[in-house]
A protein has these predicted regions:
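Proteins enriched for Cys/Gly/acidic motifs involved in redox and nucleic-acid/cofactor modification
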Residues: 1-143, 187, 193, 197
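Conserved SAM/AdoMet-binding glycine-rich loop
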Residues: 14-15, 23-24, 127-210
Length: 210
């Protein structure tokens, strides 16, 4: 797709952004058709990076090392024209290191959004007519494990349920381990929660998982 973009318009600026750029930086550097390489946690700086490129026209790679601690990259949503459902990302990264998965290397370690930051975004969207909120993350079950205190995903959901204008709350993919009796009981007390789960089941084969 990157090569096709350059072929269709030789003067276009081609930027590889996200997971591929994060894990394949050295390979992309060898490709003369790629002008910019922008990894995860630098997406919010896309416009300044492009402006810098247009000033000097130098090929560049903006890729942070996510193998150690780094801050959550906030990409806030202010308005959703003619939509009443919003996807709210509350967490990034994963510490699981499953044998078949590249996510911890591409997305880095677990980084959770501050709870008040999440609630502030939801309040703003609710004021603008959003009524349904889908809570997502790369490994959303781990929300809060890297923050000070003992607040986790269920605590966040309970607080979202208190926000005026929120009619429905849904969850993105979960790992089965989080579905405990206490977790389900507390969910039952959140009237807006839609009573179904999407569980991530990669494989039932021990040999594959090893």
């Amino acid at each position: 797709m990157l090569h096709r973009a350059k072929k269709l318009n030789p003067d276009t600026v081609v930027a590889a952004v996200g997971c591929y750029a994060q894990v394949g930086k050295e390979e992309l550097k060898k490709d003369p058709l790629i002008d910019l390489i922008i990894g995860n946690n630098k997406k919010k700086d896309l416009i300044p990076i492009l402006e810098k490129y247009f000033e000097g026209h130098r090929r560049d790679a903006e890729v942070l090392d996510l193998s150690s601690g780094s801050e959550y990259e906030a990409l806030h949503v202010r308005h959703l024209n003619e939509h009443t459902r919003a996807y709210i990302k509350v967490q990034d990264g994963c510490n699981q290191f499953c044998s078949y998965c590249i996510i911890p290397y591409a997305r880095g370690r677990v980084r959770s959004r501050d709870m008040e930051d999440v609630l502030s975004e939801i309040r703003g969207l609710a004021r603008n007519g959003c009524r349904e909120f889908v809570i997502t993350g790369i490994h959303v079950c781990s929300y809060g494990t890297d923050l000070d205190g003992d607040k986790g995903l269920i605590d966040l959901l309970e607080e979202i349920g208190k926000v005026g204008g929120v009619d429905r709350i849904r969850l993105g993919s979960l790992e089965p381990g989080i579905i405990t009796e206490d977790f389900v009981k507390r969910l039952q007390s959140i009237e807006q929660f839609c009573p179904h789960f999407h569980l991530s089941l990669q494989s039932g084969c021990d040999a594959t998982l090893k």
